[in-house]
Every structure is written in structure tokens, then in C-alpha cells.
Amino acid sequence: MRPQHEPVVTQRAVRVECIPDGRPADLPAGTPAKITQALGGSFTLWVEGQLMRLRGADADAIGKRIPSIDLAPTAPTDSGLNGVRSLVWQTLKTCYDPEIPVDIVELGLVYVCDVLPMDGGQFRVTIQMTLTAPGCGMGESIADEVCDKVLALPQVGEAHVDIVFDPPWDRSMMSEGAMLTLGL
């Protein structure tokens, strides 16, 4: 049984990214679409047989409010290294591949997440992550989203995300919860 997808119509012209190649496209006002995924602050749309990613900042283009990602209920009280490390990992769990309804941590895409103190009480975050397929055109977009969300944390002064392919990703890297969600 296929999940129900919410039909929408663009209310203004908007820039989107085509999935899976990541190329930009412009949707004119009045374009019918279906929301197939609304996770991590962005939307995946089905438009005329093509999946497209709409940034959360452009949610008004489909009549939606800009999604907010609230980490406050689970934010650690420890403002030191361990607390910031925990907050960074929580933030990574708000990042999704636009084709898969499981976050990048549960998918096993994050290989390294180093959090190091800097002068002035802030932290430098270095992340090495992979993609489910080496040819995925959305890699840069996903990495940019990861970097932007981590940099939005007030404790983080610098963030860098590298896409790596060694070791190559495979399904065994997913959490049990991810496998259950995907029916594997």
C-alpha cells in the first residue's frame, strides 16, 4: 500500500533541487505537486514524475510554514565538550536524505564527528560522512545542510563536512530502527 501524499500547488515561483542529480530547477507559480516527505526542515516534492527538494526557508511557496527544528527539549545542560558533542549528534539526526525517511545517523552515513575546543569557548566540528550511492547528486546539498545546521548551534564557531567513500556504505551500516522503518 502506498502512503498518501499531500497535494499542493506552488503559490509563487520557487527554486528547487532535482533528485537524485541535485541540479537546480525553477517551479513557476501554479505548479501542482505532492509532498512525499517533510523531514528535517525540508520538503521532498513529486512534480510531473520528478522528485524535487524544496528548502524549508521556501515553505511558503507551497502554503506551509517554515519548519523549525527545536533541540531545546533534549539539549544537554553540559556546555562543555561532552554536552556540545551530544548536541551536534542530535543536530545530525535532523538531517535526511531527501529520498529516504530515515536520518543520516540512523542510516549509518556519519563516519566521524570530531568536536574540538577553540579559543573563546566555542568549538570546531569536523564531520566525515558518506552517501548511500557514490554517484548521488544530492551529496553536496546534504553536506551543506549538515554544515549549516551544525554552524547554527551557538557553541560552534567552525564546521567542516567532508564526503568520503571509504569504507563504501552498505545496508549493514544502518541501525535496526532504520531497517525496520524501511521494511528491510
Functional labels for PLM-detected ranges:
Residues 1-184:
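Domain-level signature for proteins that mediate thiol-based redox and metal-cofactor handling
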